[in-house]
């Protein structure tokens, strides 16, 4: 499918198409305020209590923490394929982002490596969370390959408060608002151009399963306690590092993730994503509960104009955004376009959609990494 329209005309076309879809559905409900929060997507085990809000994230620091041994924390380490050496203190210094593989991305500008200049020592570089490659992690956002206009609009939404989290405890939403307000327009543009210059490449392996490893949560990220799968998946998606030491301990941007998804969710998600959930009952076509995703995101779900690609991205992130939009936590200019898409979706629908979308662009078979969705 070619993109023949100016971005503004394309957005108008999408709006008309979605309105037509809503009319075809008959009606949509108001956002499902009573739909239970997918706690796993936000990295929590229990719902927020009244008045709960995010604790501010500590600024980057190289100081030793209680009970840390100096020699262990300052010992230089390496990862396979890299000529660089860094200590654990270097790894966690978000104001001076480490770079294992400079050949994998453009030259990092100060906003990427060090953060907003106006924040001084309190700043953290974009790559401290999203990594130099922009692939992000399950607890934050994959920002590589985003259209420039979309990227800039998200920063503006964080600045204005139009982009928030449906779970008020999510700390990096608060951090993003602080950083966005401190960034100059030039820094925003440089960050958008940096991440937008890189095409998205997948690194999440989807596995359908009834059982998952027992996990613990650190910084809203699930980490496996054991390799054996003994815990029922219970309708969740559990996204964990392929190698905890590489991904978490060393922030290796080549070490990806596994997304355990319920058996059958990829196939069910395919129907929701490609048709909106249309079915045939007694020979009659029954319209589904949503609108096909390619209406806006393109036939391969890799984006169109200033609408972002979603194929192959973190399922935890995808579910958070769908739920945030459903609950009205995202109020930016694009949010109204998504309302008819998410209004009637329940938790199982969100899981199925994310499982399928992530499985569309499997990571390459490399060093034992799998290449797509499968039941294991």
Name these PLM-found stretches.
Residues 131-132, 138-146, 152-163, 177-181, ...:
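A structural feature that tracks compact, well-ordered secondary-structure segments
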Residues 1-12:
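N-terminal secretory signal peptides that target proteins for export/translocation
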Residues 128, 295:
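Short, cysteine/histidine-rich loop/knuckle motifs that typically chelate Zn2+
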Residues 303:
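Short acidic/histidine- and often glycine-rich active-site loop of Leloir-type glycosyltransferases
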Residues 28-33:
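Sec/Tat signal peptide C-region and signal peptidase I cleavage site
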Residues 14-27:
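Bacterial N-terminal signal peptides
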Residues 124-127, 141:
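Residue-level detector of short, conserved catalytic/binding motifs and their immediate flanks
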Residues 34-124, 166-292, 327-376:
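Flexible coil segments in periplasmic/lumen-exposed cytochrome c-class electron-transfer proteins
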């Amino acid at each position: 499918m070619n993109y023949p329209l100016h971005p503004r005309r394309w957005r108008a076309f999408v709006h008309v198409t979605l309105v037509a879809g809503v009319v075809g559905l008959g009606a949509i409900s108001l956002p499902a305020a009573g739909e239970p929060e997918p706690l796993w997507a936000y990295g929590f085990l229990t719902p927020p209590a009244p008045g709960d809000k995010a604790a501010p994230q500590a600024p980057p620091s190289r100081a030793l923490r209680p009970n840390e041994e100096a020699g262990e924390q300052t010992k230089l380490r390496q990862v396979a394929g890299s000529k660089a050496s860094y200590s654990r203190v270097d790894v966690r210094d978000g104001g001076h982002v480490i770079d294992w593989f400079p050949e994998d991305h453009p030259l990092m500008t100060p906003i990427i490596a060090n953060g907003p200049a106006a924040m001084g020592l309190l700043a953290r570089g974009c790559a401290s969370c999203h990594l130099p490659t922009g692939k992000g992690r399950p607890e934050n956002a994959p920002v590589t390959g985003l259209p420039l206009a979309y990227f800039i609009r998200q920063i503006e939404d964080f600045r204005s408060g139009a982009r928030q989290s449906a779970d008020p405890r999510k700390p990096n939403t608060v951090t993003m608002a602080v950083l966005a307000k401190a960034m100059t327009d030039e820094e925003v543009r440089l960050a958008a151009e940096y991440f937008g210059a890189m095409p998205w490449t997948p690194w999440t392996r989807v596995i359908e399963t009834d059982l998952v490893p027992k996990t613990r949560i650190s910084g809203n990220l699930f980490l496996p306690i054991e390799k054996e799968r003994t815990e029922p998946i219970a309708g969740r998606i559990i996204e964990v590092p392929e190698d905890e030491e590489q991904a978490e301990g060393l922030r290796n941007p080549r070490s990806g993730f596994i997304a355990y998804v319920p058996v059958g969710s990829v196939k069910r998600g395919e129907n929701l994503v490609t048709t909106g959930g249309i079915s045939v009952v007694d020979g009659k076509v029954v319209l589904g509960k949503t609108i096909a995703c390619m209406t806006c995101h393109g036939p391969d779900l890799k984006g169109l104009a200033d609408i972002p690609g979603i194929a192959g991205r973190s399922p935890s992130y995808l579910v958070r955004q769908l739920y945030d939009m459903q609950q009205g936590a995202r109020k930016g200019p694009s949010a109204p376009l998504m309302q008819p898409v998410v209004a009637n979706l329940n938790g199982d629908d969100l899981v199925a959609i994310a499982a399928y979308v992530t499985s569309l662009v499997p990571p390459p078979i490399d060093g034992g990494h799998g290449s797509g969705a499968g039941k294991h």
